[in-house]
């Protein structure tokens, strides 16, 4: 099925869609690495109702991929077949606060969530200041930093499943563990509810400043990077294992292991997704041979490899 026929089929099945529907849309500008091929079809729904109608009408055989801010992501050079969904706009990007409860759309950047909580003098969410992703990604991988994790503050998540049905998940139903959630893979999260605790605004903002300073001092945040590349294995720290295996500064094509922080890969300029993923696999191989530790990707890799070359 060609991109043209797929988008025509979608328009025929769901003629009343209000969101933006594009074909053969480049995704490289939507990822922090600035690499990757096109989406066969890219859909940006107008709101939750629009998303539900889209999924209900979509042929079940069409694969669906969801992307957020693109900070923890490698889109392979061959692009993403089927439909790629990206949430954005006011419908998915608002934050509402009622007492100690914070409700945020899943397109809200984690850093903005932390700022909103601080402005409401709600403590417990300052760690989000150190996470360069969105609320949706935080739900999917139990994102955390500086001693805090999503599981510590989430009370409920809401989303749409592949059939277009609205689903709600309690904290227990999310099944959080280290950098993982057991929520069904086909659910596209649309909002989340968090609970903070009353605190001192100045103290919370000071903590956020400390988080920011620590991140800037230790991580290559000015580079084109996807964030932490590998999960910390039990009994070790990824960056130390990578450094001990002699991988600091290692280069493959336009990709490099950061000199500043070994658990970050960077696009030096002109890198392909294959360069970055291939470098990561080489790092995994060297760490395995040097220490016996098996590193597992924290960065999500999606799409198909390029057929060129």
Swiss-Prot record:
Q: Where in the cell is it found?
A: Cytoplasm
Q: What pathway is it annotated to?
A: Cell wall biogenesis; peptidoglycan biosynthesis
Main location per UniProt? cytoplasm
Task: Note the HAMAP family from the entry.
Answer: MurB (MF_00037)
Q: Where does this protein come from, organism-wise? A: Methylorubrum populi (strain ATCC BAA-705 / NCIMB 13946 / BJ001)
Keyword check for Cell wall biogenesis/degradation: yes
User: Can you name this protein?
Assistant: UDP-N-acetylenolpyruvoylglucosamine reductase
Q: What is its EC number?
A: 1.3.1.98
Active site per UniProt: 179, 228 (proton donor), 298
Task: Supply the alphabetized keyword list.
Answer: Cell cycle, Cell division, Cell shape, Cell wall biogenesis/degradation, Cytoplasm, FAD, Flavoprotein, NADP, Oxidoreductase, Peptidoglycan synthesis
Keyword flag Transferase: no
Reaction equations catalysed = UDP-N-acetyl-alpha-D-muramate + NADP(+) = UDP-N-acetyl-3-O-(1-carboxyvinyl)-alpha-D-glucosamine + NADPH + H(+)
Q: Name one GO biological process term.
A: regulation of cell shape
What does the function comment of this entry state? Cell wall formation.
Residue span, FAD-binding PCMH-type domain: 34-221
- Name the Gene Ontology molecular function terms of this record: FAD binding; UDP-N-acetylmuramate dehydrogenase activity
Q: Family, per the entry?
A: Belongs to the MurB family.
Identify one Pfam family in the record. FAD_binding_4
Q: Which cofactor does it need?
A: FAD
| Matching NCBIfam families | murB, PRK13905.1
State the encoding gene: murB
Question: What are the annotated GO cellular component locations?
Answer: cytosol
């Amino acid at each position: 099925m060609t991109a043209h026929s797929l988008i025509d089929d979608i328009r025929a099945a769901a003629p009343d869609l209000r969101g933006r529907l594009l074909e053969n849309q480049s995704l490289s500008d939507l990822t922090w690495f600035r690499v990757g091929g096109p989406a066969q079809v890219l859909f940006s729904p107008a709101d939750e109702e629009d998303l539900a109608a889209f999924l209900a009408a979509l042929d079940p055989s069409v694969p669906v991929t969801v992307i957020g801010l693109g900070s923890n992501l490698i889109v392979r050079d061959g692009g993403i077949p089927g439909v790629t969904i990206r949430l954005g706009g006011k419908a998915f990007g608002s934050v509402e606060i009622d007492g100690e409860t914070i409700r945020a759309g899943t397109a809200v950047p984690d850093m903005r969530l932390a700022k909103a909580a601080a402005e409401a003098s709600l403590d417990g969410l300052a760690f989000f200041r150190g996470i360069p992703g969105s609320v949706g990604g935080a739900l999917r991988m139990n994102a955390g930093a500086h001693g805090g994790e999503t599981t510590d503050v989430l009370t409920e998540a809401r989303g749409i499943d592949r059939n277009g049905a609205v689903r709600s998940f309690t904290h227990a139903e999310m099944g959080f563990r280290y950098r993982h959630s057991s929520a069904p893979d086909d659910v596209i999260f649309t909002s989340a509810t968090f609970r903070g605790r009353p605190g001192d605004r100045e103290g919370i903002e000071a903590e956020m400043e400390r988080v920011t300073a620590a991140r800037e001092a230790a991580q290559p945040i000015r580079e084109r990077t996807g964030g932490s590349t590998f999960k910390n294995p039990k009994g070790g720290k990824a960056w130390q294992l990578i450094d001990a295996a002699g991988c600091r500064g290692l280069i493959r094509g336009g990709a490099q292991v950061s000199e500043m922080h070994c658990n970050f890969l960077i696009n030096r300029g002109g890198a392909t997704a294959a360069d970055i993923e291939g470098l990561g696999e080489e790092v995994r191989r060297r760490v395995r041979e040097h220490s016996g530790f098996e590193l597992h990707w924290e960065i999500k890799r999606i799409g198909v490899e390029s057929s060129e070359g």
